[in-house]
Amino acid sequence: MPVTRRRLLLVVPAALALPTLAPAAALRVPPLALQSWRLPNGLQVYALPDAAAATVSVQVWYRVGAKDDPPGRSGFAHLFEHLMYKGTRHMPAETIDRLTEDVGGQNNAFTVDDVTVYHSEVPANHLEPLLWAEAERMAHLEVDQASLDSERHVVVEEYRERVLADPYGRFFEALPALAFDVHPYRRGVIGRIDDLRAATLDDVRAFHRTYYRPDNAALIVAGGFDVADLARWVQRHFGPVEAPGTPIPRVAVVEPPRRRDEARRLAAPHVPLPAVALVWRAPGAAHRDAAALQVASALLAGGHSSRLHAALVRERHLANAVGFGADLRADAGTLAGWAIAAGGVPPARLLGVLAAETLRLAEKPPSAAELAKVRAQLTTAALVERETPAGRAEALGWALVLRGDAHAADRALDELQAVTAADVQRVAREHLLRARRVALTYVQGAPG
């Protein structure tokens, strides 16, 4: 889940009242109007011009995320995201706010495992100053001890609020660690308090030198602009930024296969009702099964008409809330189903029914109507995202980071619509039924 500088929105979509799409009615969506080039310093530039747009979205995607946190510095990529809003050699702190909010625009940022993204939207005639500001903080960030202490405090309080104070914060934080034994995906994006407190100014400077460089970034600009103007401004402001001669460190950890099923128990204070989870490892976002796993996830928990909600909440009254997610990242992924018990329901019973209903997808494929509805939901969500410049830029960025190809944003829509019931049953058998899993029981008690 993305961690933002100012806010974190976790949206669980309800079932959409949409007409079903028969396979013959598959949509043909025009591809993104993409133009791209690379500067001599390695910066990748992607332009998505739209003559009808009155605004422009500027996004800088740095290929550094929580998986790249230095040893003993969990949460550092996220902490650094906050520090990028401090001053630079030629730009006082809060300048990004003045260049966006003061002209009716907005800005924000988020950090996930594979990437850190800075995104702004302004009226189209304010594009060049924003490009200057992004190049300036890429090249000349300056952070002092007071700024580090201030932003560290913000992030520590974020951890307290989202993980320690939330009755189920520890529960959801534990799921990645259950999926991975050695890959840094097992760490939380926000980090641990002791690691955050250990960060130093030297750490900050080294991190910026190592990862915040033109050859580790993609600049995506979408909206109302002329491509020739954009190319001239990008060269003017980003062209002089030098790329270090040192290589960029990359995570090369290969997760060993899980040999057996495991069961874990986690206790935490102030847990009003027990919760359970089942966690499997999954392939990465570029895998051929990614679209089918996305469809399978939506069939299981995509709103109130989904299989898990119907079986555990509406019909049997075993759970107050359920979910299932296919979190497919660049290197690998996880599949996780979870449920929060209804009053008086033993965790063991809830876990058994959760497992049975999840694995039933491998035995009973979706009906034509069920599959068409889910495909319509997912396709509609993707099309709604593309209605704005910011949404089109973000779709392109995710394709670039997770699949290594910006054009995969277009193929993804066709791949979703091509998923069949047999595909869903096949991936459920391969990645759920035949795969090893970890079962978690979460209860009230003293933390271990």
Predicted regions and their residues:
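Non-catalytic beta-strand/loop surface segments
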Residues: 23-66, 90-126, 162-216, 240-287, ...
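N-terminal secretory signal peptides and thylakoid transit peptides that target proteins
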Residues: 1-15
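Active-site SXXK
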Residues: 74-88
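M16/insulysin-pitrilysin zinc metalloprotease superfamily fold
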Residues: 86-90, 121-152, 303-304, 327-385
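Short pre-active-site segment immediately N-terminal to the catalytic Zn-binding motif
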Residues: 66-72
